[in-house]
Regions:
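Gly/Ala-rich beta-loop-alpha elbow adjacent to hydrolase catalytic centers
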Residues: 46-51, 55
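Residue-level signal for short, function-critical loop segments
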Residues: 49, 75, 142-144
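Second-shell loop/turn segments in exported
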Residues: 15-23, 102-107, 140
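Catalytic nucleophile-loop/oxyanion-hole region of alpha/beta-hydrolase
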Residues: 11-39
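Conserved alpha/beta-hydrolase
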Residues: 1-13
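Hydrolase active-site cap/lid region
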Residues: 66-115
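Serine-hydrolase catalytic core
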Residues: 109-179, 190-202
Length: 207
């Protein structure tokens, strides 16, 4: 298992991720793919939120390296309740190119970082085809109102179909009350249902 840290992420100053650029993310993904290429006969990639954005890119541009992908509430664009659709291009162009001072959603998520992940998504293959991909797993929290869940399902379905891969698309059980935080152990619901959730992730990945 290889768990890399994305550029400017995971630092003591939680706002440093706002410095990230799409070009840095692409280099990070390419370097990571090179590091894991010799780890085994079958490789998979798992990503949550922005990590799901990157996992989708790796599946398509990994030259057949990854046969499985698990997308946990992947962030391709914000839900319309967070950012109206007509503003997404503005977010991508203005904040993605660092033309305005950064702002932080809920005091934590950088607009600039969010915009650069959208830029990565904009550079997916038109047909979303991923050579060598055998299975796509998608899990979205039942109470997740941060991501465009319809887009997440559409991208996962199209990538699976055009790659000749199987697809497992599930939503966490409503009684768990899981939102966007599918893996953070500090989340109350994740902590309460940790075993059930992690069993679900393994099952959907391996199906």
């Amino acid at each position: 298992v290889y768990v890399p840290r994305a550029p400017h992420h995971g630092l003591k100053d939680g706002k440093q991720h706002g410095k990230v650029r799409a070009s840095e993310l692409v280099k990070f993904m390419s370097d990571s793919a090179g590091l894991v290429s010799g780890l085994g006969d079958e490789l998979g990639v798992i990503g949550h939120s922005g990590g799901g954005t990157l996992a989708t890119w790796l599946a398509q541009y990994g030259d057949g390296l990854f046969s499985r992908v698990l997308l946990l509430s992947p962030y391709y664009e914000p839900d319309a309740s967070q950012v109206p659709k007509w503003q997404v291009a503005l977010l991508r162009n203005v904040y993605g190119n660092h033309l305005l001072p950064d702002q932080f959603f809920d005091g934590a998520l950088s607009y600039r970082a969010l915009a650069n992940y959208v830029i990565v998504k904009q550079n997916y293959r038109n047909d979303l085809k991923a050579v060598g991909l055998k299975h796509v797993g998608l899990i979205i929290g039942s109470e997740d109102r941060l991501i465009d869940s319809t887009m997440a399902r559409d991208i996962a379905e199209k990538m699976a179909k055009n790659s000749g891969a199987t697809l497992t698309n599930e939503t966490t059980p409503a009684h768990m009350g899981i939102g966007h935080e599918l893996i953070w152990p500090g989340d109350k619901s994740v902590k309460q249902y940790k075993k059930e959730l992690y069993d679900m992730y393994v099952r959907v990945y391996e199906r």
